[in-house]
Amino acid sequence: MSDKSSRAAARARAHASGTYPAPLNAGRSRNMQANRRSGTKPEAALRSALFKLGYRYRKDFLLRLGDGVKVKPDIVFTARKVAVFIDGCFWHVCPDHGRQPTTNEWYWSPKLRRNVERDRTVNQSLTNAGWRVLRVWEHEELQDAVAAVVDTLHHLEHGFDTSAED
């Protein structure tokens, strides 16, 4: 079964079980599926800037943390155990720019709430497994995002514990 058909089957099961409400129409569903999960402009810009500085990383690298927990950060520094996520303001409910949609609130409110809860769970799972988690909002200035990643890597490379700085 292809990846696309397995996603469609999983979506159909979720709709049938009531886990996720069915889309209102096929056109809207198609539009939402076209939204990128990875390779967004903020991700590409951050990756490019880090690469130019000489940092090497894995992109969308699947981490298996045990107990069936799988996580796929946007940027992963495997040797240093640093996971970087670039979060979209809408999808991850940015406190500055995240807005609740006014249409189909019955659908969006629980969905966005689940996204935020999943982010918390992922952060905790990674931390428990000894990983350092960095979350960058898509609206953050590129130089600030680069500085946050570089500072974390620098501190870890030189034996400083940065966990109390969050």
UniProtKB/Swiss-Prot annotation:
GO terms for molecular function: endonuclease activity. The keyword Nucleotide-binding does not apply. Residues 7-17 have a biased composition (Low complexity). Residues 1-41 are annotated as: Disordered. It is an enzyme of class 3 (hydrolase). The keyword DNA repair applies. Residues 28-37 have a biased composition (Polar residues). Pfam families: Vsr. InterPro entries: DNA_mismatch_endonuc_vsr (IPR004603), Restrct_endonuc-II-like (IPR011335). Its EC number is 3.1.-.-. One of its GO terms (biological process) is DNA restriction-modification system. Keywords: DNA damage, DNA repair, Endonuclease, Hydrolase, Nuclease, Restriction system. NCBIfam families: vsr (TIGR00632). May nick NaeI sequences that contain T/G mispairs resulting from m5C-deamination. If unrepaired, these mismatches can lead to C-to-T transition mutations. The very short patch (VSP) repair process counteracts the mutagenic process by repairing the mismatches in favor of the G-containing strand. This enzyme is an endonuclease that nicks double-stranded DNA within the sequence GCCGGC (C-methylation site unknown) next to the thymidine residue that is mismatched to 2'-deoxyguanosine. The incision is mismatch-dependent and strand-specific. Belongs to the Vsr family. This is Type II nicking enzyme V.NaeI. It comes from Lentzea aerocolonigenes (Lechevalieria aerocolonigenes). The gene is vsr.
